[in-house]
């Protein structure tokens, strides 16, 4: 059975209250593709690794897509009304401004594919940690990996330069 068209602007207005931290991400359709609306602000320090391409359409406000490009960290600004197709296998970290809203489309993973979350040293860009896993639910599969990384001072300490990757405030008691 065909799903009727979705009025995207009306959907955003009706669900705007859900597009806020800590999650800020709502899947609106999933059938071959994962179609999400994502609101800002966010303060992600991880990089997502996807074996398929990801399509970004910035509806409101702006974002910066931080990417790891041949061992170099660089920023790709995406403003309201702009689209960007991220090629497969490019580690990326979406940084969304307060009040921003974007549409992200990813294809559903093939059975043999793994998603990944990676962290890089903010001082020297050395890879600190990477976890690969089969993605089943983007809203529930990421948090346990975040917890594992942020709760470990050893994982967050750069073996190359000694810098300690900061953890979000809710993990502050771990460092005490």
UniProtKB/Swiss-Prot annotation:
UniProt pathway annotation: Cofactor biosynthesis; NAD(+) biosynthesis; quinolinate from L-kynurenine: step 3/3
* GO biological process terms on file: anthranilate metabolic process; L-tryptophan catabolic process; NAD biosynthetic process; quinolinate biosynthetic process
Please tell me where substrate binds in this chain.
54, 96, 106
InterPro entries, per this entry?
3hydroanth_dOase, RmlC-like_jellyroll, RmlC_Cupin_sf
Catalytic activity, as annotated: 3-hydroxyanthranilate + O2 = (2Z,4Z)-2-amino-3-carboxymuconate 6-semialdehyde
Question: Cofactor note from UniProt?
Answer: Binds 2 Fe(2+) ions per subunit.
Specify the signal sequence span: none
Assigned EC number: 1.13.11.6
- Alphabetized Gene3D superfamilies for the sequence: Jelly Rolls
Q: Which residues bind O2?
A: 44
The cofactors it requires, by name, are: Fe(2+)
Class of the enzyme per the UniProt entry, highest EC level: oxidoreductase
Which residues bind Fe cation 2 per the record?
121, 124, 158, 161
Record key words, sorted: Dioxygenase, Iron, Metal-binding, Oxidoreductase, Pyridine nucleotide biosynthesis
Keyword Iron on this protein? yes
* Recorded GO MF terms: 3-hydroxyanthranilate 3,4-dioxygenase activity; ferrous iron binding
Query: What domain of life?
Result: Bacteria
Instruction: Give me the residues that bind Fe cation 1, please.
Output: 48, 54, 92
What family is it from? Answer: Belongs to the 3-HAO family.
Its function, per the record, reads: Catalyzes the oxidative ring opening of 3-hydroxyanthranilate to 2-amino-3-carboxymuconate semialdehyde, which spontaneously cyclizes to quinolinate.
Assembly and binders: Homodimer.
Task: Output this protein's name.
Answer: 3-hydroxyanthranilate 3,4-dioxygenase
Q: Which organism is it from?
A: Xanthomonas campestris pv. campestris (strain B100)
Q: Which gene encodes it?
A: nbaC
